[in-house]
């Protein structure tokens, strides 16, 4: 919000495909980009009180949320807890310092480090369930007072934080998260564990008001089959993490290979990830226009 140009945050990860590629970029190199997508955003307008939890490079979308809320909502407050190994590994350190100076009464930031000692013992170590519970007990955070809590980082940190917040009484719908480095998928409904249909399937897709169909072979992922048939469906990570390819199964049956982003209630209502979906009936209808 309010920035004159597109910017991205990249943190080098050993063996990381994109970070390794990005290190080789030179001035004047041209990249193709897509418009911002995904659901990990905060609505701008009104008055809100947000808690943001981030670890490592997971702070990238968190920074955008904090900046957009502070700039776009004059009466809103943002509390950020940011976990890193040490001071040198902090991303956007100067940008966060500038936000603190600009919004003295509305932006509170706490650093948590596991390889560098700080004056307050509580802020040493990892951001785990025990630490968040202790911070709540001491009044450093007030989980029940936040309109929403946004979490981004490695899956163990997200799982621990979500569980701690749930124990503290935060309703699940107020806890929003985005995975950067998954280690194991979220649970998938047991009905989705049946084998995929032995023969091929007919797939019909509703996208932008139009209905199109194609045939796919048994064992193929829907997103791959659609691409092979010349149909472009919305997607980004293709790993089940971002939910850009989220759609609703309105007819037929199918299974997801893995799920890192859909909540249990979404699965119960029939939502699936196209990049992880395989039919297990001879006809399936998927609606990408379903909200």
Where do the PLM segments sit?
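Short internal beta-strands
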Residues: 6-9, 76-85, 110-113, 176-178
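Short, Lys/Arg- and Gly-enriched loop/turn segments at beta-strand edges
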Residues: 38-45
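A short, charged/proline- and glycine-enriched loop
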Residues: 45-50, 199
